[in-house]
Amino acid sequence: MAGHSQFKNIMHRKGKQDSVRSKMFSKLAREITVAAKAGLPDPTMNARLRLAIQNAKAQSMPKDNIERAVKKASGVDGENYEEVRYEGYGPGGVAVIVEALTDNRNRTASNVRSTFSKAGGALGETGSVSFSFDKVGEITYKASVGDADAVMEAAIEAGAEDVTSDEDGHTIICGFEDMNEVSKALEATLGEAESVKAIWKPQNTVPVDEDKAQSLMKLIETLEDDDDVQNVYSNFEVSEEVMARLSA
């Protein structure tokens, strides 16, 4: 399992999800607004908006918040958010990709650069690390939707490329361009997914020790705490022993 996925599980176990709920809703609302602005404000006619709303619902975002975010896209005085990607290296030479939605590129770039520097890393040029990742679709389901064999069969039928099942749930990987169709096919068989999103999947992972893992987790946590940052991806790998100690 890649380090960032392990980090997400650790944060969940430590109960940090509740403290960042408001921030998470804000990020989900921003994605809904941008998706609605980029196409039609009707989720049945706008695949990106449909998935953004689906992900918001999966996180129990109130219906009023979702509707308000959609309406905000048509507002004359609404903020104009720009999609920006930053790439760099964290401690131990680990590759990191940061996706942001910002109304001020200079502010966001300055904050991201400062965060990398303070963590002992460095921000690079666009393209400096993304060549070692593949952009794919990731569809997740709770473990309760079925056993590994049933989910694997449904995923193959839907046109997915890979499936990972464990006690935390099922993660299905598909081609980025196929994400909308695959998610629809899976929904017909397994029901609505917990999340459907495009991710940067590392082609190879870099093993790190406990000290480096702690530094990287702090870097990721600080980046994700930035209001403009939507997603952070990395290619580090942590052993089960180290993960157990970090989870304690």
Swiss-Prot record:
Recite the UniProt keywords alphabetically.
Answer: Cytoplasm, DNA-binding, Transcription, Transcription regulation
Using the chain's own numbering, where are the disulfide bonds? Answer: none
Biological process (GO) annotations? regulation of DNA-templated transcription
Top-level lineage group: Bacteria
Q: Name one GO cellular component term.
A: cytosol
Short name of any one Pfam family annotated for the protein:
Transcrip_reg
One MF annotation (Gene Ontology) recorded for this entry: DNA binding
Q: Where in the cell is it found?
A: Cytoplasm
Primary residence: cytoplasm
Q: Which HAMAP family match?
A: Transcrip_reg_TACO1
Q: Which family does it belong to?
A: Belongs to the TACO1 family.
What name goes with this protein? Answer: Probable transcriptional regulatory protein Avi_3631
According to its UniProt entry, this protein's organism is: Allorhizobium ampelinum (strain ATCC BAA-846 / DSM 112012 / S4)
